[in-house]
Regions:
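Short glycine- and Lys/Arg-enriched binding-loop motifs that mark or flank ligand-binding interfaces
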Residues: 3, 20, 33-36, 57, ...
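Short, composition-biased local secondary-structure segments
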Residues: 10-17, 36-40, 115-118
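Substrate-binding N-lobe of the ribokinase-like
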Residues: 23-90
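Conserved phosphate-binding/catalytic loop of the ribokinase/pfkB sugar-kinase fold
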Residues: 56, 81-83, 93-130
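Conserved functional loop/turn residues at catalytic and ligand-binding sites
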Residues: 10, 75, 96
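Positively charged, low-complexity intrinsically disordered leader regions
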Residues: 1-23
Length: 130
């Protein structure tokens, strides 16, 4: 099956904390890990691993190069990803010792999609002009 996914790309910054911050608090985290994320990225990788021919379309900004690499290494076609000089989307995720999380999203280039870009992607995909 041939799948087009026009989906989000985020860098996930996961901070392990003993408890969530409260207003006015400043604390050090116990650790920091960086992951590839975004619902769109996760869906594209899962669909490719399931044996589908997947094409991912998105706008990718500064700081997100690893996201395109992760997609490509998972067998996802990344030819329709448009580069941008703006900052890519990211998530700041606090995870406490019980595994609960608190997430702050920055949309970044995920919010810069234009009608023209979407129309171009759909035309290329529909006409096999990839």
């Amino acid at each position: 099956m041939k799948i087009l996914n026009l989906g989000s790309l985020n860098v996930d910054y996961v901070y392990k904390v003993d408890k969530f911050l409260l207003p006015g608090e400043t604390k050090s985290s116990l650790s920091l890990n960086t992951y590839c994320g975004g619902k769109g990225l996760n869906q594209s990788i899962a669909a490719a691993k399931a044996g589908n021919e997947v094409y991912h379309a998105a706008v990718l900004g500064k700081g997100g190069e690893m996201l395109k690499t992760a997609l490509s290494e998972s067998g996802v076609n990344v030819d329709m990803i448009q580069p941008s000089d703006e900052t890519c989307g990211h998530a700041i995720i606090q995870v406490d010792e019980k595994g609960q999380n608190c997430i702050l999203l920055y949309g970044g280039t995920n919010r810069t999609l234009t009608k023209e870009y979407i129309d171009d992607v759909l035309d290329k995909f529909g006409n096999n002009g990839l």
